[in-house]
A protein has these predicted regions:
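Short hydrophobic/Thr-rich beta-strand motif most characteristic of the beta2 strand and flanking loop
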Residues: 27-34, 42
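Active-site beta3 strand of CheY-like receiver
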Residues: 46-52
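Receiver (REC) domain active-site loop signature in two-component systems and cognate sites
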Residues: 57
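C-terminal output helix
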Residues: 105-118
Length: 120
């Protein structure tokens, strides 16, 4: 069985590395992006099952990247989990996201949220 692909879009290397390690340990295949531009490119090319999207990133922030995902017919159904230290950032655009996680987030909550949005 092929592992479920999770795209992690996070500009801080250490945070991205920790999430990747946690998710790989839980049996997920992790695709990494350091900004919204890379996240869109990876989503188009690799079609992840779910995206964990930081809201504050260089080049293209997570909110803009998620709006772009929702505008593309082949990508709009991919669940997106917003991750931010400032949840008020997504309050006006909550409908774009399948879940919102406050940073920092425990590994258990991250995995549980991914499983919830995937219907597991």
């Amino acid at each position: 069985m092929t592992p479920t692909k999770v795209l992690v879009a996070e500009d801080y290397d250490d945070a991205r590395d920790v999430m990747a390690l946690v998710l790989q340990s839980a049996g997920f295949q992790v695709i990494e992006a350091k900004d919204g531009v890379e996240a869109l490119e990876a989503a188009r090319a690799l079609k992840p099952a779910v995206i964990v999207m930081d809201m504050f990133m260089p080049n293209m922030d997570g909110l803009t990247a998620t709006r772009a995902l929702r505008d593309e017919p082949s990508l709009r159904r991919i669940p997106v989990i917003a991750q931010t230290a400032q949840p008020s950032v997504v309050s006006g655009a909550r409908e774009l996201f399948d879940a919102v996680l406050a940073k920092p987030c425990s590994p258990d909550i991250l995995i549980r949220t991914i499983c919830d949005v995937l219907g597991r």
